[in-house]
Curated annotation (Swiss-Prot):
Protein name: Phosphoglucosamine mutase
Gene3D superfamilies: Alpha-D-Glucose-1,6-Bisphosphate, subunit A, domain 3 (3.40.120.10), Alpha-D-phosphohexomutase, C-terminal domain (3.30.310.50)
Active site: S101 (phosphoserine intermediate)
EC number assigned by the record: 5.4.2.10
Source organism (scientific name): Rhodopseudomonas palustris (strain TIE-1)
Keyword Phosphoprotein belongs to the record: yes
UniProt modified residues of type Phosphoserine: S101
Name of a matching Pfam family: PGM_PMM_I
Any Gene Ontology biological process: carbohydrate metabolic process
Gene Ontology terms: cellular component: cytosol
Lineage: Bacteria, Pseudomonadati, Pseudomonadota, Alphaproteobacteria, Hyphomicrobiales
Cofactors named for this entry: Mg(2+)
Length: 450
């Protein structure tokens, strides 16, 4: 069955475009019905980021859940990993995060978590999706069985304590000057407070949300302001979260960005040395740099690759028993602590290493030199350009040229008629020639099919 609503990270789209109050109401009803098992009183935790449309979607979801007899616990603006954690700790049947993650304010989304704090399986999402297109009027609760909604106090403190417990109790961040960029998003209150409680000298930016400025020229997808602030304040480290704080990138004391691949390298190596790796392996996606794979191999650590998307990384981790995984974009999953990506918890592990080693971030977090990587997109109108004989030949020729010295990844986008061509290797000029050859062949095939 093709999926009309759910993508790789819940339901996401333009607010009042795809994401309407009507859809949110229906999602609340369908998800509420899907998770009402047993005779106990059922309840759902709902959190959100700071987008203007969050109010609209939150109220519609509340109406949907309460109409099928579910009680609603509202926690307000909170990081996605906090909502996942609270869903489990508050013994809820379901968790919901209203967010479009790193997108700008015009978009919004609905992420769903099961009772243990994990994102829903494909099968459960399909079950909910089927109900979205049918009438649920006959399944609504009777008047005396409707749900109630209440706002929960103290949830910020719960997440702060949870995050602090991922570090040794005796560890202090005293002496570290930290610039934190919360992307004007969900973490704008809790993360600066947590860093202060741990003893850091905290300088905060991206902590003045107005409903419109989430991820706007700030956060993990736009770290330029953070880089400048780190240099200006002569800070030891910068931390950039995205709008819902499930991804992170760091900035060293020189103002240089440290991406998710470098974070996987430093955490993987450090945890292996400390005997904390569950197995000698790290899970990443097909987009992670070949330099990471080579570095880990030199440390006796395998790199397992999955399709793009943190849900696939987590699935592989749970299936094979690995406890470190993530994406180059900064989704870092440490399954000893979390059931989903947690940007702040990942950053704390690196801060702990910096304190332990007594060395600057530029030394701690630069474990390998990334190979030159080139990514180009080819748009097409119709047909199947990847089946064209000229394209197949160009790909085969490219693989021969890069054999042993690089790799190719050619994949169609899951959301638009675009084919992404990524190449990386030791020689940038060769990689560029190979990628351009494939792009030209795809362009010719697309033009012929138009």
């Amino acid at each position: 069955m093709s999926r009309r609503y759910f993508g790789t990270d819940g339901i996401r789209g333009r607010a009042n475009g795809l994401i309407t109050p009507e859809l949110a109401l229906k999602v609340g009803q369908a998800a509420g019905l899907a998770f009402q098992r047993g005779e106990h009183r059922h309840r759902v935790v709902i959190g959100k980021d700071t987008r203007l449309s969050g109010y609209m979607i939150e109220n519609a979801l509340v109406a949907g859940f309460t109409s099928v007899g579910m009680d609603v616990l509202l926690v307000g603006p909170m990081p996605t990993p906090a909502v996942a954690m609270l869903t489990k700790s508050m013994r809820a049947d379901l968790g919901v995060m209203i967010s479009a993650s790193h997108n700008l304010f015009e978009d919004n989304g609905i992420k769903l978590f099961g009772p243990l704090g994990y994102k829903l399986s494909d099968d459960v999402e399909k079950q909910i999706e089927l109900m979205l297109d049918e009438s649920l009027d006959k399944k609504l609760a009777q008047s005396a069985s409707l749900g109630r909604a209440r706002r929960i106090d103290g949830v910020h403190d719960r997440y702060i304590e949870f995050a602090k417990r991922t570090l040794p109790r005796e560890l202090s961040l005293e002496g570290l000057r930290v610039v934190i960029d919360c992307a004007n998003g969900a973490a704008y209150k809790v993360v600066p407070e947590a860093l202060w409680e741990l003893g850091a000298d905290v300088i905060s930016i991206g902590v003045e949300p107005d409903g419109f400025n989430i991820n706007k020229e700030c956060g993990s997808t736009a770290p330029q302001a953070l880089c400048a602030k780190v240099r200006e304040m002569r800070a030891d480290i910068g931390i950039a979260l995205d709008g819902d704080a499930d991804r992170v990138i760091l900035v060293d004391e020189r103002g240089h960005v440290v991406d998710g691949d470098q974070l996987l390298a430093v955490i993987g190596q450090s945890w292996k040395e400390d005997g904390r790796l569950a197995k000698p392996g790290v899970v990443a996606t097909v987009m992670s740099n070949l330099g990471l794979e080579r570095f880990l191999a030199g440390e006796g650590i395998a790199l397992l690759r999955t399709p793009v998307g943190d849900r696939y990384v987590l699935e592989q981790m749970l299936k094979d028993g690995y406890n470190v995984g993530g994406e180059s974009s900064g989704h870092i999953i440490l399954s000893d602590f979390n059931t989903t990506g947690d940007g702040f918890v990942a950053a704390l592990q690196v801060l702990a290493m910096v304190q332990k080693l007594g060395r600057p971030v530029s030394e701690v977090c630069r474990r390998f030199d990334p190979l030159p990587q080139i990514l180009k997109n080819v748009r097409y109108r119709s047909g199947r350009p990847l089946d064209d004989s000229g394209v197949i030949s160009a790909i085969q020729d490219g693989e021969k040229r890069l054999n042993g010295h690089g790799r190719l990844l050619i994949r169609p986008s899951g959301t638009e008629p675009v084919i992404r061509v990524m190449g990386e290797g030791d020689d940038r000029d060769v990689v560029e020639e190979v990628v351009d050859s494939i792009v030209d062949a795809l362009g010719n095939a697309a033009a012929a099919a138009a």
